[in-house]
Amino acid sequence: MDRIIGLPDEVLVKILSFVPTKVAVSTSILSKRWEFLWMWLTKLKFGSKRYSESEFKRLQCFLDRNLPLHRAPVIESFRLVLSDSHFKPEDIRMWVVVAVSRYIRELKIYSSHYGEKQNILPSSLYTCKSLVILKLDGGVLLDVPRMVCLPSLKTLELKGVRYFKQGSLQRLLCNCPVLEDLFVLLLRCDDIGMFIVIVPSLQRLSLYLSPRCNLEGFVIVLDTPLEYFKLVDRNYDRHPYMIENMPKLTSAYVEVISADLKSLVESITSVKYLTIFSENYDDFVFPWNQPSTVPKCFCPVYKSSPVYKSSPGQNT
């Protein structure tokens, strides 16, 4: 212990960065010197899916009192895991405001509360110049203001979030000029309208549609030079796909139930590696005679295409 105490503060903070935030905070009782060392940590994670109500109340008091006093000039990562409905939206907004004021690089929020739409994201988040990674999971409302610009955002992950109105997602995407990786899971019956992705910088897109979504009038429009595309559509409502401008597409995974599989695949002809899974191949049947050799002129960019079909009494 004496050897550790003799180390410089910078080294002690580095050591604390390798342990959970809760453990790092607990070292503040060791001595006067250790009291505020954890406040120099650049990666913070608070909350747990297994917290009791009393634990969440203690966490709320702790964050209200200590987070505004955090000393690190830059917060590399700030993560909140909130699996309780007792948090007030204004409290969460204040915590995010503090993180944004510290030039945050990564923000991840998980909320398991699926009650009424409550906005827990401050408007300052949508103009954060330093934010590179944004991940929202669960009962988080995406209410995009008119003033939005995320010039550094490269990774955006939206799992089961709620959308304030039609066009919220499109407005956000249009103001992310360097976005490279987009993951969207539509989980509940939000009135999202058209899913439009026109992002020239986007390289990877993963889209999941839950069978619980009400997708009446839903249209998917993709116009972006992707390199990787994954579509998992388990919804039984038929909805059109408008896909174009994917000349750089290298790999694609398509898993659909009721979509027009043939037209969908025909719209991604430049792909090199294609994986298809569907319960319905009725509109995707074509005659095939196995040739002894593959002509050189036959689809020069094509390399492989696993096709999976499940039927009763037959292995895939």
Swiss-Prot record:
| Top-level taxon of the source organism | Eukaryota
Q: Where's the F-box domain?
A: 1-47
InterPro entries reported for this sequence: F-box-like_dom_sf, F-box_AtFBL13-like, F-box_dom, FBL13/AtMIF1-like, LRR_dom_sf, LRR_FXL15/At3g58940/PEG3-like
- Which Pfam families does this entry report, sorted A to Z? F-box, LRR_At5g56370
**CDD domains per the UniProt record, alphabetical:** F-box_AtFBL13-like
Output this protein's name: F-box protein At4g09920
Instruction: State the organism of origin.
Output: Arabidopsis thaliana (Mouse-ear cress)
Taxonomic lineage of this organism?
Answer: Eukaryota, Viridiplantae, Streptophyta, Embryophyta, Tracheophyta
